[in-house]
Amino acid sequence: MNADAVQQYQHRTVLLDEAVDALALGGERANGVYVDGTFGRGGHSRKILQQLGSGARLLAFDKDTQAIANAATIDDQRFEIAHDSFATLSEALAVRGIKQVDGVLLDLGISSPQVDDATRGFSFRADGPLDMRMDTTRGMSAAEWLATETEQKIEKVIREYGEERFAFQIAKAIVARRAVEPISSTRQLAEIVARTVKTREKGKDPATRTFQAIRIFINQELEELEVVLNEAYRYLAPHGRLVVISFHSLEDRIVKQFMAGKANVPQPDRRLPIRAIDLPQPEMKLLSRVKPSAAEISENPRARSAVMRVAERLSPAARVVQ
């Protein structure tokens, strides 16, 4: 990708207006406490700050050191960023004495600048070190993991996190190749997969699923998502909004099931003598499922797989059936 194309992608936040609107920042809520769990390059945070009142507070998270450096350009006493995973939400709020929040926004996946920077190792389109860590200051790189992991575990990761039907063959090829030389670059891994996967999906590079799987595993993306969903719910004030943008089916499935589990509760047999006030009540209300418009996808093709789900925490009074 040339420099112009890289620049083109750097400042495009997917579903920017829709996500911030979903937080419902008007009225008294304008002076609430909000969380941007994935600062990235700050598109959502900056727009949220534009709509918040002087008494509001916005706490952002990001594991990427480049994102933290970018956040330093925001000179606003209402804003603070934590160099950590959003899975540490509970600890971060407790340290700051925050008892509840009025909205949580999560924009999952990786940002365009991360993909386009070959030194990060996220993309198979340009050669670079096989790293794939969101936070390059911590943890094991993809190259280090592939050098030591068992063939069975590599297969499991590629199959489960990449939904790759050739996971067995790819894992076998990786182990065979590492016996000859270290697999230390994105090009090496992409070539291994390309030689192994004989059936090609239309419009998709054969390495797509394998790179996704390893990235998800290295960064514990799905485990951290499950943690933050529960912590966000725990801290949401009545009528607080949970807004989540996901980019692949594994993420979206977790978000959908979590929200549905809070919104839909099993009802006991109606023939049982149970008072209405004692019946199980929903804890959240499902508000919307939004996809990017055709216009946004045309301007930013990377938005095409995005899905935004929005739910609102119900107040105790609202959860009682009258």
Curated annotation (Swiss-Prot):
Q: Is S-adenosyl-L-methionine tagged as a keyword?
A: yes
Name the Gene3D superfamilies for this protein.
Putative methyltransferase TM0872, insert domain, Vaccinia Virus protein VP39
Binding-site list for S-adenosyl-L-methionine: G42, G43, H44, D62, F86, D107, Q114
Give the Gene Ontology MF terms in alphabetical order: rRNA (cytosine-N4-)-methyltransferase activity
User: What EC number is given for this enzyme?
Assistant: 2.1.1.199
Which source organism? Janthinobacterium sp. (strain Marseille) (Minibacterium massiliensis)
Q: What class of enzyme is it?
A: transferase
Q: What is this protein called?
A: Ribosomal RNA small subunit methyltransferase H
Q: What does this protein do?
A: Specifically methylates the N4 position of cytidine in position 1402 (C1402) of 16S rRNA.
User: Per the record, what is one GO cellular component?
Assistant: cytoplasm
What catalytic activity does the UniProt entry give for this protein?
Answer: cytidine(1402) in 16S rRNA + S-adenosyl-L-methionine = N(4)-methylcytidine(1402) in 16S rRNA + S-adenosyl-L-homocysteine + H(+)
Q: Where in the cell is it found?
A: Cytoplasm
Q: Where are the transmembrane segments?
A: none
Q: Which InterPro entries match?
A: RsmH, SAM-dep_MeTrfase_MraW_recog, SAM-dependent_MTases_sf
